[in-house]
């Protein structure tokens, strides 16, 4: 989809836009988003980041997905200037024009910016969504004093409903007027009076700090019940970030003794027995009873169209 394609759909007689979920937590699905909801979401973001008619916005994501669609709607709402470029990882490699006030990027693009500070300097503010921000990327952006934010949201909420300043905050703060609480599972419940959906119950395990602040821990879908101990893979992944220099995630496999046990899945074709044994020992030292019992190597991780890693459990 091009910007013109989206604008044609935006200005047609329908009161909704067709969108696709990312598929990171299940099969991608087609949903209809009310244009009024998209405008309300855009206004919340524009208010939070001071986006107005004099702002210059960069569209570097495909309008096929909600993040790209919402950048266009933000520009429409604010009457801001929008520049669209090809949505590839090597961001701003050949761009030498005026700097931008605001852009939404995925983690792979943010990594490119962190590796090329001269390009990052052309963006006053970036929001990073579509996948988790790795500890390594967070550290790089913090060292560069980037005005960068990790976002929390989903297609169903018309993009993000909360943001976290990378390198400074450990918790997310909602965009007004959204408020949050937790259900009996410890999962986030978001109340959004400005959107027609009203309330969304998620599968994200959180610590609620206030009605507008929460700390994200991980997905309940990924949680591992090992001998009565609840293990949240995303927390382990953050704790061991300094032990690996390749992509990895914590998966699980069945165990006749413990029910389930964690497994470290690593994207590599080159791991010697010596390296494997040393890594398992380091994991036991770092994580104790939560440590993975096995290391599985994959030549390449499966990804969704938006670049999220698809977790595959051992069976």
Q: Which residues are covered by each model-predicted region?
A:
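AMP-binding/adenylate-forming
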Residues: 34-40, 56-112
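Conserved pre-ATP/AMP-binding loop-to-beta segment of ANL
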Residues: 3-20, 53-54
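AMP-binding/adenylate-forming catalytic core of the ANL superfamily
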Residues: 203-290
